[in-house]
From Swiss-Prot:
This is LYR motif-containing protein 5A. InterPro entries: Complex1_LYR_dom, Complex1_LYR_ETFRF1_LYRM5, ETFRF1. GO terms for cellular component: mitochondrion. The gene is lyrm5a. Belongs to the complex I LYR family. Pfam families: Complex1_LYR. PANTHER family: ELECTRON TRANSFER FLAVOPROTEIN REGULATORY FACTOR 1, GROWTH HORMONE-INDUCIBLE SOLUBLE PROTEIN-RELATED. One of its GO terms (biological process) is negative regulation of oxidative phosphorylation.
C-alpha cells in the first residue's frame, strides 16, 4: 500500500470505529464487522482499487451519520409531539 493511501485507510478506519460507538446493535458487533471488512481487503495493492474502497467507506460514513441523525430526530419528535392515533 502506498504511503498517502495508507494514511487515508487508517483515517477511514478510525472514523468508522468512532462512529460505531452509537451503532444500534452495539459497539462490539460493529467493531467485529468493521475489522472483518478491512481484513478482507488487506491484500489489495492496486491504488485505484484502494481508492474505490476508501470512497465506499466514506459513503458508509455518510450513511451512518444519516442513520444517527434520523434516530435523534425521532427521539426529539417523540419528546415534543403527542403520538397520533
Amino acid at each position: 500500500m502506498t504511503n498517502p493511501l495508507r494514511g487515508e485507510v487508517i483515517r477511514l478506519y478510525k472514523n468508522l470505529l468512532y462512529l460505531g460507538r452509537e451503532y444500534p446493535k452495539g459497539t462490539a458487533y460493529f467493531r467485529e464487522r468493521l475489522k472483518t471488512a478491512f481484513m478482507k481487503n488487506k491484500d489489495v495493492t492496486d491504488p485505484e482499487k484502494i481508492q474505490k474502497l476508501i470512497d465506499r467507506g466514506d459513503f458508509v460514513i455518510k450513511e451512518l451519520e444519516a442513520l444517527y441523525y434520523l434516530r435523534k430526530y425521532r427521539a426529539m419528535k417523540k419528546r415534543y409531539y403527542e403520538p397520533e392515533h
